[in-house]
Curated annotation (Swiss-Prot):
It is found in: Cytoplasm. This is UDP-N-acetylmuramoylalanine--D-glutamate ligase. It catalyses: UDP-N-acetyl-alpha-D-muramoyl-L-alanine + D-glutamate + ATP = UDP-N-acetyl-alpha-D-muramoyl-L-alanyl-D-glutamate + ADP + phosphate + H(+). HAMAP family: MurD. SUPFAM superfamilies: MurCD N-terminal domain (SSF51984), MurD-like peptide ligases, catalytic domain (SSF53623), MurD-like peptide ligases, peptide-binding domain (SSF53244). Keywords: ATP-binding, Cell cycle, Cell division, Cell shape, Cell wall biogenesis/degradation, Cytoplasm, Ligase, Nucleotide-binding, Peptidoglycan synthesis.
């Protein structure tokens, strides 16, 4: 391939799952290159899996290797503002990421999704629906399997979740369609402000044939002119409309599926479903073949996932909600007939939880159950708020009063590491409690 003609020395910065996928890809498909790895950690994860031909410098930077490189492939966790990377850029050496290498190598259609919240669900759902339509699909990127490993599948379609970090080093990924779901404050430790963060996200549209954007969030629109497909919770393009008293997901006014047929919980997931339908349409897939799969889809583990539904009491695991924006999204348009028992708390990371107060005030019959290190910070948000030490304490306290129509939802708006190793362990603990008490 022409772009590799003058590339002999490649330095991969940062190992781990992504770095290892880059190394394996280079060794297999660009055997003429000399591959070296720099990782500032003493014992980088994946070290034991490195091919023997690949040199590793660990525990610090290696400025000589960087100076000798014709190409540097940086892990998305490493900010381009890092002084060592800035030196490489100033010297005129290209700095790319694994997604850029994927873009150089892929020869089948690809779609990608970015956004502050919901991108993992849309990525997974789009893959599920494309598979239901009969395609061999590779799903990954920022979620699950690294993009370069997906190339081994020789899929008909690739569906990628892309983070702002990955997009910073991506400039020539040709996408059949790209979706930008929403924009809310995140990663402000990495970016100079919201404009900087948005600019990174907008790179997803650079070589895309179609931009799928949120009518309710103009920040998701590209800054340059290109074909647009919009989604939202009104009756335009991909949207919703009430027909004979029933709300339907619609495609330019054409009814597709009643929203009540979705297993997914929450209004944000209605929007997520619309994005997946739009992505399928733009790559020429008949989404009507996938509607049964859409109805049955119950979400990614730990993301507004219905983990039990007995005696008409729904238990919803949204442990992935580690920030306020995620919990706000989960609460938006939440439908339940009885009382909502909302479990919040953990490590607040200095967040301002006051945004939750007006949303909680609008909900019918809510019991705010606060636990963990920063439980007290949630107490002023609702008159029903009570504090507990642990999740189990909450469930033991409320289980006897649960009745048909109630919903028990873990959407903590906090990190988990006061009581759990990670948000997955927290979600698993909630799921076990749900099965025990449902």
């Amino acid at each position: 391939m022409e772009r590799w003609q003058n590339i002999q020395n490649v330095v991969v910065v940062g190992l781990g799952i992504t770095g290892l996928s880059v190394v394996k890809h280079l060794v297999k498909y660009q055997p003429q290159t000399h591959v070296r790895v720099i990782d500032t950690r003493e014992l980088p994860p994946g070290k034991e899996s490195l091919p023997e031909s690949v040199e590793l410098h660990s525990g610090s930077w290696n400025s000589q290797w960087l100076a000798e490189a014709d190409l540097v492939v940086a892990n998305p966790g490493i900010a381009l503002a890092t002084s060592e990377i800035q030196d490489v850029i100033q010297a005129g050496t290209p700095v790319v990421g694994d997604i850029e290498l994927f873009g150089w190598a892929v020869n089948k259609p690809a779609v990608a999704i970015t956004g502050s919240n919901g991108k993992s669900t849309v990525t997974d759902l789009t893959g599920v629906l494309a598979k239901a339509a009969g395609l061999n699909v590779g799903v990954g990127g920022n979620i699950g399997i690294p993009a370069l490993d997906l190339l081994e599948l020789d899929a008909d379609l690739y569906v990628l979740e892309l983070s702002s970090f990955q997009l910073e080093t991506t400039s020539s990924l040709n996408l059949a369609a790209a979706a930008f779901l929403n924009l809310s404050e995140d990663h402000m430790d990495r970016y100079q402000g919201m404009a900087d963060y948005r600019d990174a996200k907008l790179r997803i549209f650079n070589n895309a044939q179609y931009a799928i954007v949120n009518r309710e969030d103009k920040e998701t629109y590209p800054d340059h002119s290109m074909p647009l497909v919009t989604f939202g919770l009104d009756d335009q393009e991909f949207g919703v409309a009430t027909i004979d008293g029933t709300e339907w997901l619609t495609d330019n006014g054409k009814p597709v599926l009643p929203s009540q047929d979705l297993t997914l919980v929450g209004r944000h997931n209605v929007a997520n479903a619309l994005v997946s339908l739009a992505l399928l349409k733009q790559v020429g897939i008949d989404y009507n073949k996938s509607l049964e799969a859409l109805k049955a889809y119950n979400g990614l583990t730990h993301r507004c996932q219905v983990v039990a539904n007995k005696r008409e009491i729904k238990w919803v695991n949204d442990s992935k909600a580690t920030n306020v924006a995620s919990t706000l999204a989960a609460l938006s348009g939440l439908e339940y007939q009885g009382t909502l028992y909302l479990l919040v708390g953990g490590v607040g990371k200095g967040a301002d939880f006051s945004e939750l107060k007006p949303v909680l005030a609008q909900l019918d019959r809510v019991q705010l159950c606060c636990f963990g290190e920063d439980a007290a910070q949630f107490m002023p948000l609702h008159p029903s708020a009570k504090t507990f030490d642990t999740m189990r304490d909450i469930i033991e306290s409320i289980s006897a009063q649960l009745v048909s129509g109630d919903m028990v939802m873990l959407s903590p708006a906090c990190a988990s590491f006061d009581q759990f190793n990670n948000f997955m362990a927290r979600g698993d603990a909630f799921t076990e409690l749900a099965h025990e008490y449902a």
